[in-house]
Structure formats: C-alpha cells, structure tokens
Amino acid sequence: MVDHLKRQDEKVFAAIEAELGRQRSKIELIASENFVSEAVMEAQGSVLTNKYAEGYPGKRYYGGCEHVDVVEDIARDRVKEIFGAEHVNVQPHSGAQANMAVYFTILEQGDTVLGMNLSHGGHLTHGSPVNFSGVQYNFVEYGVDADSHRINYDDVLAKAKEHKPKLIVAGASAYPRVIDFKRFREIADEVGAYLMVDMAHIAGLVAAGLHPNPVPHAHFVTTTTHKTLRGPRGGMILCEEQFAKQIDKSIFPGIQGGPLMHVIAAKAVAFGEALQDDFKTYAQNIINNANRLAEGLQKEGLTLVSGGTDNHLILIDVRNLEITGKVAEHVLDEVGITVNKNTIPFETASPFVTSGVRIGTAAVTSRGFGLEEMDEIASLIAYTLKNHENEAALEEARKRVEALTSKFPMYPNL
C-alpha cells in the first residue's frame, strides 16, 4: 500500500517518510505518545475505512454492517475483560469527545463541576476557560499541595462541601502520582455528586494491574486509547450499566455521526495486545524506566515536581536552570530528544512559555529502552539543558542521541 501512495502522491509520501525518519532518529519522551504495533497500523489502514456504520452493533442505520458489528463487539468485550466494566462505548473519536459525552449525559448548562486545575496537572476538558467545558459549565478547581505537589484530598472534600458540584472529575494530564479513586468516590458520595475519572494517561498501567483501577469506584471512566494503552488515537467510555443507554445516545446521535470503523478495528487489536502476558511486563518496564529516569535526573541536580513519579510521567521544573520550558523543549529537540513544555503547579509563566517540561517513558519502553538507556537519557537531558547555549556541547549531545537510537531500530518492515 505504501508503494501505491508513493506512486499516487509523492508529496504526502515524502512527508510520511520524513516523519518515520524523525521517529527512528529521535528519542521520543512526550508522555502522551507511544509507538503502536504494525498490526494496529494494518487494522487502521484496512478496508474498514470505507464503511459507514451509524448506530451500534445489531442496530445500525446502514446496511452491510455485519462484519463491522463483529469488530466493534470484539473491541467492547475486550475492554470489559481488561477493566471489569459493565458497559463500554468505543466510538468516541478522542478523549475530549468521551469527556464531552459524559458531561452531556448528566449535566445541564451552568451546572457546577469540580475539576483539577490545569497548571496543577488537569486537562483542558476539566474546566479550562478556553475549552467548551469551562464555557458550558461552572467549574470549580482543586489542586495540589504547595509543598508536596500531591492532591490534597481534604481540600477536595472542603471544596466539594462548599460548592456542592453535580460532578467531580478525577484524573490528570500531568500528575506523576497515584490517584486515590476510592477517596474521590467517598467525597462524591458525601456531597451527592457523580464521579467521572479520566484515566487517559494511565489506562495501560491500569490494564496491567499496576495502577489502581477506577472502574469499581467511578460512575463514568473515560480514556484515550493511545498513550500507555498503546493503541490508535481515539477515545472510549466505561460506565455503570444504569447509564449505558444515555451514554450511547450522547455519542450517537448526540455529538458524533458515523463511527470510524477502521480505528475501532485498530482499538480492538490493541485491546487484544493488552490482554497478553507480555503487556504486563511492558507496563512494569514503563514504571521501572520512569523511576530510573527520575532518579537520574535528580542526581544531575534537576528539580522534579512532587519529587519523583509513581507512573510513566515526570514533570521537570527548569527554573533553577534559569531557562523556560519553551527554551528547554526547543534545545532538547535540537539534539534529538522530543518533549513538551508544560505548566507546573502554581505557575507564573504563560502557557506558551511555562516553567516546566513534561516527559514520559511509554514510547521509549516500546522501543526497547531499559534502565541503562534511562541513565544515558537523564545524563543527556541534564547536559543539554545546562549547556543550552554551547553549540559544541549540543553537537556532542546529538552524537550521543544518534548512538543511542541506532541501537534500537524502529519499524524495520516499513
């Protein structure tokens, strides 16, 4: 199929080839990214991209859905097996749309919701004023403790009692510690609120049994299907059976039309991979690598938000290096290490500048990097940031990155 693309559209082919080269030659540390299997890519590039299938298995608005019904049922059944969910909807095109569907299911415009502050580790869809969630609903923020940088559950309870939200949102996009979902449910029950958990970043760790599972505690669980779950880009919703019909209606016909059946097929393949024994080994290696990388960074004198990590994610506070997150992201990319600038708790810089850098170990672990490689990456990051204006040092860092990536070939069959 790549041969067809090359003949048909040289410009698009060239851009894709260049991206493949980038992924092969750089160290991918963006916490929300991963490398899917070739089987997942084959499913996503299959003839299922041709099929419209509005509705759900057994109740479609189009004919000819007998085979895509099988695929969607496989995906749903595998998610139920992985997470122990009563009901699953695998049609959301993204995590943001999964969150939107839950909001539309139980909230009215202007309802009060308690969500995590974006700079403290939350997500745009958890009430940011520039996002639909912050526009449509009255979000009240909770955050982390100023000293420990961990969620202060007593503060969450106090704010829940004060504001009496209809919904509490737990989960994060930049929080490196375990979240106590049981405690969140207790708080929700105390104030009569629903609980939604967004486990997008940690879903793969939950699937492997290496992070507490929110499903037994939450009324609704949303997630992306990529990140640590190592599937295609997309979303899904897990919920109690009592909300099944409402959730399904919120997705279709509520906020989406036809599902992307080729993506759902790729999701199904990834879920099948997550059920294999070696996926637990992979997830454990993600955590081991993150801990080793965090230790290495601290030995190099770098400051980590909350002092370390319990999952795949590390947040570096770069202020003591007298640079910004924006500068750190740029200079690391220049030497071949891909990260993203990120706000930190109690941030004073703008979101376009930031005081932090967010990194994660899911992608490099998929590539086969282990503890020794984490030591080298920690050294490389510190060396690059401390010498960000020294071109000779940056050239040396580039050579070290090249030496490291050359040992771990990527997608040799592509």
UniProtKB/Swiss-Prot annotation:
Catalytic reaction annotation: (6R)-5,10-methylene-5,6,7,8-tetrahydrofolate + glycine + H2O = (6S)-5,6,7,8-tetrahydrofolate + L-serine
Main function: Catalyzes the reversible interconversion of serine and glycine with tetrahydrofolate (THF) serving as the one-carbon carrier. This reaction serves as the major source of one-carbon groups required for the biosynthesis of purines, thymidylate, methionine, and other important biomolecules. Also exhibits THF-independent aldolase activity toward beta-hydroxyamino acids, producing glycine and aldehydes, via a retro-aldol mechanism.
Protein's name in the database: Serine hydroxymethyltransferase
Organism: Bacillus cereus (strain ATCC 14579 / DSM 31 / CCUG 7414 / JCM 2152 / NBRC 15305 / NCIMB 9373 / NCTC 2599 / NRRL B-3711)
Principal place of residence: cytoplasm
Chain positions recorded as (6S)-5,6,7,8-tetrahydrofolate binding sites: L118, G122, H123, L124, E240, S350, P351, F352
Entries under InterPro entries matching the protein: PyrdxlP-dep_Trfase (IPR015424), PyrdxlP-dep_Trfase_major (IPR015421), PyrdxlP-dep_Trfase_small (IPR015422), Ser_HO-MeTrfase (IPR001085), Ser_HO-MeTrfase-like (IPR049943), Ser_HO-MeTrfase_PLP_BS (IPR019798), SHMT-like_dom (IPR039429)
Subunit structure: Homodimer.
Listed cofactors: pyridoxal 5'-phosphate
Record keywords, A-Z: Amino-acid biosynthesis, Cytoplasm, One-carbon metabolism, Pyridoxal phosphate, Transferase
Cited SUPFAM superfamilies: PLP-dependent transferases
Gene name of the encoded protein: glyA
A single Gene Ontology CC term: cytosol
EC number: 2.1.2.1
GO biological process: glycine biosynthetic process from serine; tetrahydrofolate interconversion; tetrahydrofolate metabolic process
GO molecular function: glycine hydroxymethyltransferase activity; pyridoxal phosphate binding
